[in-house]
Amino acid sequence: MSQFKRVEDGIFIAPQPTEQDIQEAKQQGIRTVIDFRLSSETATSNETLTKNHGLAYVNIPVNKAALSASQISDLDAAMKGKEGPFLLHCETGARVALLLSLSKAKQHDWTTEQVFAEAKRMGFDLKSSPEFSAFVMRTID
C-alpha cells in the first residue's frame, strides 16, 4: 500500500485511490472505504468500484467551505457501523486528517494544539488552511 498511510491500528488514510489501489486494499485486509469527496470532484464515484471488489463503501461529502460538526459525527458513526480495517480518503487526504483528528479530540478531550499535532503526525498542516484552522478553533472551544 504505497500511498496508504497507516495512522493507527485498522485505519489507513490516502489520497484518491485508483482501481489498482482498491484491489491492493482488499488484499491487505481493508474492509471499508470511507470517501470524503464531493460528487463534483470526480466524474465517477468510488462506490461501484469499491463494492465490485467486495468492500463496504461510505461517502461523507466534505466541502472545505461548509465544514460542520455533523461530519465528525458521521465519521464516528461510519466507523462504529462498519467493519474495519478502514481506508479513509479524499483528493489529497487533508480532509481525512482534519476529521479524524477532530474525532480523536472529541474522544480524548484534546486541545486545539493536540488536534494540529495529530494532523501533522498524519502528514498534514491544518494551520496552513484558513478554513481548516478556523474549523478546529470553532470545534474545540
Summary of predicted features, one role per range:
Residues F86-A97:
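A phosphate-binding catalytic loop at a beta-strand-loop-alpha-helix junction
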Residues M1-F86, S101-D141:
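Cys-dependent protein tyrosine phosphatase-like superfamily
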